[in-house]
Amino acid sequence: MAPGEKESGEGPAKSALRKIRTATLVISLARGWQQWANENSIRQAQEPTGWLPGGTQDSPQAPKPITPPTSHQKAQSAPKSPPRLPEGHGDGQSSEKAPEVSHIKKKEVSKTVVSKTYERGGDVSHLSHRYERDAGVLEPGQPENDIDRILHSHGSPTRRRKCANLVSELTKGWRVMEQEEPTWRSDSVDTEDSGYGGEAEERPEQDGVQVAVVRIKRPLPSQVNRFTEKLNCKAQQKYSPVGNLKGRWQQWADEHIQSQKLNPFSEEFDYELAMSTRLHKGDEGYGRPKEGTKTAERAKRAEEHIYREMMDMCFIICTMARHRRDGKIQVTFGDLFDRYVRISDKVVGILMRARKHGLVDFEGEMLWQGRDDHVVITLLK
């Protein structure tokens, strides 16, 4: 047999052996994992409730004397005696682990539940409504606990400040009422016999109530509730989708009808209305587009652009000519045209606009290249 055929024959055998070894390794790993999982589940099921792993450990330096187990500990350690052990472990190991299991101590686990943000807000609103609604004597125990819990919670600083102010005002008011309460009534027999006892008792009570009302500032209704009610009303009125769409459509329809009456190219053109509403020379807005329209926006942008070009031309005139003794700056139209035509071809138009705004001055109504090159342009700025 050729050596090539021998190598090709040994290749499949090696691959088959490799596959078998891999399969046996995987099976053994799976068995070991399953055995460990079973032992762990049995161990967890036999552990007493409330036990923390590693929670309490005895110090190895100071061993305590072993006390005989009580009946309760025997009952707990009884189901732990037959745990499953992997193959190959002797009885000696089980006898050594038995006393370790019997020394397990119990520990109660307490869990504290912290209220969320919306629950704190509900508690604050509940307390505020109760203070606004009830004018009687507060219970000494429960309200203080609720107040302390809310004030010491990690809620909103604004909410804590409002609640703290409300509580401080209420406590001050109740203290004043408790201090002034003995002065409202008189236990004297002379006052009762004289006939002033009943009225004297009723009047100070009314005065005390008035004083308490003045000193205790109870928001009725609270500003927060009123603010939220106003916001809700505004939201319903302003942000109603149907009402919004209807109002906008009606407004657009009215504006369109009015514009068609003033449009001379429309069939609904009203000549009398147009003549009565037209602007005359000297009126504000005459010769300008209507404010708020796109034409007015385009006109504003054009004015800004032309003003920048006029300022550029004045700057170029300043750089070209020399200052005279009288302070005037002059340049001929031919020199300015040769220089500025490289920047913009609207030389004459910008000069005419600048003369209208009082920035430059020159003779003639119009300037022509070649014919008016000798015309002097004076900068007035």
Swiss-Prot record:
Polar residues compositional bias, start-end: 69-79
Chain segments carrying region Actin-binding 1: 199-299
Biological process (GO), any one: actin cytoskeleton organization
Chain residue ranges for the region called Interaction with actin: 240-285, 352-381
Location within or outside the cell: Cytoplasm, Myofibril, Sarcomere; Cytoplasm, Cytoskeleton
Listed GO CC annotations: actin cytoskeleton; plasma membrane; sarcomere
Domain of life per record: Eukaryota
Region (Disordered): 39-156, 179-207
Chain positions with Phosphoserine modification: S156, S188
Gene3D superfamilies: Costar domain (1.10.10.1540)
Keywords tagged on the record: Actin-binding, Activator, Cytoplasm, Cytoskeleton, Phosphoprotein, Protein transport, Transcription, Transcription regulation, Translocation, Transport
Region (Actin-binding 2): 300-381
Biased composition (Basic and acidic residues): 97-110, 179-188
GO molecular function, one term: actin binding
Subunit composition and interactions: Binds F-actin and ABLIM1, ABLIM2 and ABLIM3. Interaction with ABLIM2 and ABLIM3 enhances activity.
Domains as described in the record: The actin-binding domain 1 (ABD1) is intrinsically disordered, and binds to F-actin with higher affinity than ABD2.
Function: Acts as an activator of serum response factor (SRF)-dependent transcription possibly by inducing nuclear translocation of MKL1 or MKL2 and through a mechanism requiring Rho-actin signaling.
Protein name: Actin-binding Rho-activating protein
Natural source organism: Homo sapiens
Higher taxonomy: Eukaryota, Metazoa, Chordata, Craniata, Vertebrata
Name of encoding gene: ABRA
